Design a protein with these regions (language model features):
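Core alpha/beta catalytic barrel or barrel-like domain that forms the active/cofactor pocket
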Residues: 83, 87-89, 124-128, 197
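Carboxylate/His-rich catalytic cores and anion/metal-binding grooves
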Residues: 183-188
Length: 197
């Protein structure tokens, strides 16, 4: 993957969104810790901005479920995740989600691919200067507000908070995201476990 592939894929997505008349809703963008993920996600954001579509880009890496949440929380038409999931680390990938927060399915997948394939010249892809995109409000950085909302929704799913309150301080937990993206949402500031400190 390279910036030209990212730009072509994003231009196809932008064209599809514009033809659907949903360009005012924006697109949420997340990325993982793979090589060039931050750069590729910014390239996607600037292509969207150049097409007049607001790009909401996470300030740092985030997991896929949080992107899915952000698409719905921010009322976006789509989401982009720059990741190759479980594939070897030398690879990267580009996944698209629709406004329901799920990966694209028919007819959207076929419609987006048709738009991508219709781009036969890279001169037909657009980009914008980052400073200009921010100034025009077309590039918005997603920070802790979405993290907090996401964790708030997850906490609503707790089945027995009393058990956590009673026994949580005695649990010894070791967690590592390895090379993954769980380091932000799984931090002590977001966990509901009481501490001994």
């Amino acid at each position: 993957m390279n910036i030209y592939v990212v730009r072509k894929a994003t231009q196809g997505l932008a064209n599809y969104i514009i033809k659907a008349g949903k360009q005012d809703k924006g697109v949420a963008i997340a990325y993982d810790s793979r090589r060039m993920s931050p750069e590729f996600s910014m390239e996607a954001a600037l292509c969207l901005a150049a097409n007049g579509i607001k790009a909401y880009r996470f300030e740092s890496l985030r997991p896929t479920p949080e992107l899915s949440f952000a698409v719905r929380y921010l009322d976006c038409v789509a989401g982009i995740n720059v990741t190759a999931s479980h594939n070897p680390p030398e690879y990267n990938g580009y996944k698209v989600y629709w406004e329901d927060g799920a990966q694209i399915t028919p007819p959207h997948d076929q419609g987006i691919m048709a738009e991508v394939k219709a781009i036969t010249d890279f001169a037909d892809t657009k980009t914008m200067d980052m400073v200009e995109a921010k100034k025009k409000g077309l590039l918005v950085t997603i920070g802790s507000e979405v993290d907090d909302a996401y964790m708030g929704e997850l906490k609503k799913l707790i089945l027995n908070q009393d058990a956590i309150d009673k026994y949580g301080k005695d649990l010894k937990i070791v967690y590592t995201p390895l090379h993954g993206t769980g380091n932000i949402p799984v931090s002590y500031t977001h966990l509901t476990l009481p501490t001994n400190s």
